[in-house]
Curated annotation (Swiss-Prot):
HAMAP family: LutA
Protein name: Lactate utilization protein A 2
Biological processes per GO annotation: lactate metabolic process
UniProt source species: Bacillus cereus (strain Q1)
PANTHER family, A to Z: LACTATE UTILIZATION PROTEIN A (PTHR30296:SF0), UNCHARACTERIZED PROTEIN YKGE (PTHR30296)
Top-rank lineage group of the source organism: Bacteria
Sequence similarity: Belongs to the LutA/YkgE family.
A Gene Ontology molecular function term of the record: oxidoreductase activity
Lineage: Bacteria, Bacillati, Bacillota, Bacilli, Bacillales
Name of the encoding gene: lutA2
Membrane-spanning ranges: none
GO CC terms, sorted: cytosol
Protein function: Is involved in L-lactate degradation and allows cells to grow with lactate as the sole carbon source.
Amino acid sequence: MKVSLFITCLSDVFFPEVGKSVVEIMNQCGVELDFPEGQTCCGQPAYNSGYQEDAKLAAKQMIKAFEHSEYIVTPSGSCASMVHHYYKEMFKGDSEWYEKAVHLADRTYELTDFLVNVLGKNNWKSKLVEKAVFHQSCHMSRALGIKEEPLKLLSQVEGLDIKELPYCQDCCGFGGTFAVKMSSISETMVDEKIKHIEATEANLLIGADMGCLMNIGGRLRRKNKNIQVLHVAEVLAKGLSK
């Protein structure tokens, strides 16, 4: 099986360890992994800001970059949902690019979705002794319907005690450009999220979208909270049996 890694902007610039963890995970699974160098931003920031033509340019570049990929895996529910839902929306009036967008979406998977529903992983060999909570990101859980897959994988990590996070379905307040345009509302939302995390007495927050982790993690640091933040890929790669 051949898999192409769609790294995303946030992993490339802010969370390189997440990308490295995905590589370790795929190696453990015996998957042949490549990295198409022509990939770029998926176009979501431009699309959400109303710059349709700029978003289309980014989408076309992504479609070209992954044209020959068998499977495309990304450690981001947000970017995966952009490819799955909004590429087709952008190219509705262009039959050629619409078909290409559909073809790309059909081969694109969020990481935990791929591990559980394509590779059928049910006995993950990693270890991390921590008390943790899992944050359900909006795009991943609502747009893609991926809720149980990350929890199923995390339940297989030796030593990891996952506590139930109150109001886990609530947005953390990031929302891409929302956090910039409506910063005061965003701050209130992330403070509420932190309050619920603290109520569990967990010392580790796990998530599957780096935008959420950047937002919550940044707020935790600003408030001097001693709670570690990790992407699910980093957790799955911890103490991985070689």
